[in-house]
């Protein structure tokens, strides 16, 4: 049975305030109209005193009048992030990027914040998540926390999802905006100098994957791009290769080929005569393997670097092969370090930064300069020393 209410005179700018039969006060304000029925939509407030209700109305009325009021959503963080991930992100992201986002959402974000209503999510909630993950946030069972870089990636996902919610009027401000991220220390880049590169190549020559290692060292090409390379991507007459796809592993799908992540990653790389010669020799050897395999060989994939049946080489398996070669050579470098080795040697040989940036597929020359700042600083010092020594010799 509904309770009767006692109407009182409406105060200036209060909206509507009434006193209930049980003694409590009730306030309401018109916030809009139902688009389907045309009926009024009102927001109700309750309090023990008239002033308590009046104060609540005073806060909301200006927002209603200026069109900035948003009715708090009842959707939870878990519900919204799941919707955002599958409805908004999946159609536009590369499979590997989407999989990475899903891992962050399901592994880190929902377990910590999923129970909260989206409208209740505050900066402090998100900041506590970052702080906790920094101390003990690993999901692989190992001790210790996540790196500042990993925290920044989680932040990117959270900020993006909340920004979409803000655009849709589900929240007024993005609470991730005011969080403070841990400082990222620039890691020292490990690469091979010219002498070490020579040792690596001498050792790698014993491997059947020598052509792949030689190409990587001469171009700075990424692992996935290397393993996704097709013969049709190599122009022996123009002495160039074109990066059109990469090989990646996606959970639930296995190994797949996908387009480069950016337009700049889809690039043309010039090849030196020595590289072309190694590739020609590799192709001749591959043709022999293909003849032995017969119809079992997957020639349709047209892969430059494939297994004995023409199928893709698993990126992780390829990395393990590389690591064994490095160990035999007595060196300490990752496969990605070959990319840094190429860039460093190119810089030291006087190749301009713009050319290196385009070859590596970096988004800007400034980024390339930032990544190799320690190398360029060393080069500048050496140049200054050479000029200084030359000028000093003139006054002796």
Functional labels for PLM-detected ranges:
Residues 233-240, 331-332, 351-373:
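Short, polar N-cap/turn motifs at the start of nucleic acid-interacting alpha helices
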Residues 142-148, 152-154, 165-231, 236-237, ...:
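Basic, Lys/Arg- and aromatic-enriched nucleic-acid-binding interface segment
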